[in-house]
């Protein structure tokens, strides 16, 4: 018997709602509809996310988005079987909005609820694409707050092979963009500008590139960009595109080479890239070329699903339920986990 799952995402500065139908057996759940509201315009004036404003905007948006998804799918709210929501990690106030709405809906409808790990949502989001991956695979999870390489044997079976010891790749993009005065959100702005510059104009470090392990470090690169920007002084405006291109090339080279090293270490022949930085064109181009040479398949989420969204939360819930690894409940006294490592939900071998 199939299940209709409503997913709500509110961990940071996007409000997302989606409906997924999960069938019996191993069939990939089907996305029926999703709606998303980004708060970028609201936070631009502040140069970054203001948590209190983010929480208030989630309150305004989540129910209208739910109605939009129901209209688009042709489904009725009372036919929803499970209400899933992002339990963490993320901004505490923002998480509480999504959790509160999900549990209120569950209580009103007498339907069970399920808290989902935000990073697992990203990790499983490529299953929403027209070319879903198969287990096992190496996953590169790369976003503003996280950079990790994992061996993924199945839903809930994650082995962390390496992770950042300081800044995440997305943070390196954003902070470097801020140093160049590119505004918010910095990462996409830096990547657009990089298309006009030379990736070899400046010699920037590739931290831990030859460390022999699969960990990452981007703090030193960020410092090098700051030093270079100060050295340029008045020339920065004229050389900004070159500095952006050189910065992007340094970050991407590390991500690609570490991913290839993870493939070599595990012997796997499939890569999944997930998280907001997975939308970066240069990363996709370089990783595609490297994987083609290595005869390895690479999978990404659809571009519009690289950002935070409700579809990935509904999908993660559906896949957990299908695998019989987690059961929804009617305990509506919810809690959230602003800090929640992915290995905390990994099943024992």
Swiss-Prot record:
It is found in: Cytoplasm. Signal peptide: none annotated. Its cofactor is Fe(2+). Substrate binds at residues 141-145, 174, 187, 280. Its main location: cytoplasm. Its EC number is 2.3.1.234. Fe cation binds at residues 118, 122, 308. InterPro entries: ATPase_NBD, Gcp-like_dom, KAE1/TsaD, Peptidase_M22_CS, TsaD. One of its GO terms (biological process) is tRNA threonylcarbamoyladenosine modification. GO terms for molecular function: iron ion binding; N(6)-L-threonylcarbamoyladenine synthase activity. GO terms for cellular component: cytoplasm. Binds 1 Fe(2+) ion per subunit. Coiled coil: none annotated. It catalyses: L-threonylcarbamoyladenylate + adenosine(37) in tRNA = N(6)-L-threonylcarbamoyladenosine(37) in tRNA + AMP + H(+). Required for the formation of a threonylcarbamoyl group on adenosine at position 37 (t(6)A37) in tRNAs that read codons beginning with adenine. Is involved in the transfer of the threonylcarbamoyl moiety of threonylcarbamoyl-AMP (TC-AMP) to the N6 group of A37, together with TsaE and TsaB. TsaD likely plays a direct catalytic role in this reaction. HAMAP family: TsaD. NCBIfam families: gcp_kae1 (TIGR00329), T6A_TsaD_YgjD (TIGR03723). Belongs to the KAE1 / TsaD family. This is tRNA N6-adenosine threonylcarbamoyltransferase.
């Amino acid at each position: 018997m199939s299940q209709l799952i409503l997913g709500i995402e509110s961990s940071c500065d996007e409000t997302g709602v989606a409906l997924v139908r999960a069938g019996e057996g191993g069939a990939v759940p089907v996305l029926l509809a999703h709606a998303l509201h980004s708060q970028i315009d609201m936070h631009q004036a502040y140069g970054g996310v203001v948590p209190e404003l983010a929480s208030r905007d989630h309150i305004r948006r989540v129910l209208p988005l739910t109605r939009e998804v129901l209209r688009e799918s042709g489904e009725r709210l009372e036919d929803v079987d499970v209400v899933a929501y992002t339990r963490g990690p993320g901004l505490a106030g923002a998480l509480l909005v999504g959790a509160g709405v999900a549990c209120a809906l569950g209580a009103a409808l007498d339907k069970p609820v399920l808290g989902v790990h935000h990073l697992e949502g990203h990790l499983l989001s490529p299953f929403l694409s027209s070319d879903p991956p198969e287990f096992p695979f190496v996953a590169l999870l790369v976003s503003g707050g996280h950079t990790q390489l994992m061996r993924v044997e199945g839903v809930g079976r994650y082995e962390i092979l390496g992770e950042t010891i300081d800044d995440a790749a997305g943070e390196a993009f954003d902070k470097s963009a801020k140093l160049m005065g590119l505004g918010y959100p910095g990462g996409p702005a830096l990547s657009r500008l990089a298309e006009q510059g030379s990736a070899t104009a400046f010699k920037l470090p590739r931290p831990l590139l030859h460390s022999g392990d699969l960990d990452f470090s981007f703090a030193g690169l960020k410092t090098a960009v700051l030093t270079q920007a100060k050295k340029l002084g008045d020339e920065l405006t004229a050389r900004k595109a070159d500095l952006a291109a050189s910065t992007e090339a340094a970050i991407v080279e590390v991500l690609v080479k570490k991913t290839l090293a993870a493939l070599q270490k595990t012997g796997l022949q499939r890569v999944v890239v997930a998280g907001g930085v997975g939308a970066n064109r240069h990363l996709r181009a370089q990783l595609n070329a490297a994987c083609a040479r290595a005869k390895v398949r690479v999978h990404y989420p659809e571009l519009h699903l690289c950002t935070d969204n409700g579809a990935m939360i509904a999908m993660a819930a559906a896949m957990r339920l299908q695998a019989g690894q987690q059961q929804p409940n009617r305990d509506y006294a919810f809690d959230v986990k602003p800090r929640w490592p992915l290995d905390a939900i990994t099943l024992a071998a």
